[in-house]
Amino acid sequence: IETIIGDVHIPSSNTTPESYLVQKYFAQMVEAGCQICVMEVSSQGLMMHRTAGIPFEIGIFTNLAPDHIGPNEHASFEEYAACKGMLFRQCRHGIANVDDEHFDMVLAGHTCDLETIGFSDRADYRASDMELIGRPGYLGVKYHVSGKIDMDVEIDVPGRFSVYNSLVAIAVCEHFKVSQEDLKAALKVVKTKGRIEMIKVSDDFI
């Protein structure tokens, strides 16, 4: 867990730092010339008002499950979902996974504009024709997205969850008018530390 400002990496003990640190880091980002900040806002961070007063441009919901929280983090799963939902009364625009079984619970009472992603016909950004790609030393997934955009996508991180994550990225990039060419190129090479990182042993093993 860390805060990254340009080439500077600042370790953090919390997913969402304390409010005074959030504001301190925002100030440092402005001084460094940052124009956009991406942050993970945890349910506890929202519950403890660490992001209070911040008018987020976009809020994102991908999924929710009981095993996402520890025994001392929330009094109940319902409280957890309600805290997650606070983000969508604090942002101008929401992007949410309509396939998730807790979609309605989390988005209840939202005050933002809302777009949806998923495999469902209800989704504004709909994934279809998902196919696992396997080559010597390589695993990925490809699919087609339709609705508010029409394009084929390939990601070198396999799994259905990767489709959901990339759909969110596509919706966000559409908001900022990123070209399809740049979007496709970025999705093809994006990596997340510790998430299905490939270790090549030989062409026969991964």
Predicted regions, residues:
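Short hydrophobic/charged patches on amphipathic alpha-helices used for structural packing
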Residues: 26-27, 48, 85
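Conserved helix/coil segment N-terminal to the catalytic DExD/H
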Residues: 45-52
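Short, conserved loop/turn and helix-capping segments at secondary-structure boundaries
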Residues: 13-19, 54, 74-78
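Short glycine/proline- and charge-enriched loop/turn segments
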Residues: 6-12, 62-63
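Conserved nucleotide-sensing/catalytic segment adjacent to the nucleotide-binding pocket
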Residues: 9-42
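Acidic, Mg2+-coordinating active-site environments of NTP-dependent enzymes
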Residues: 30-38, 57-205
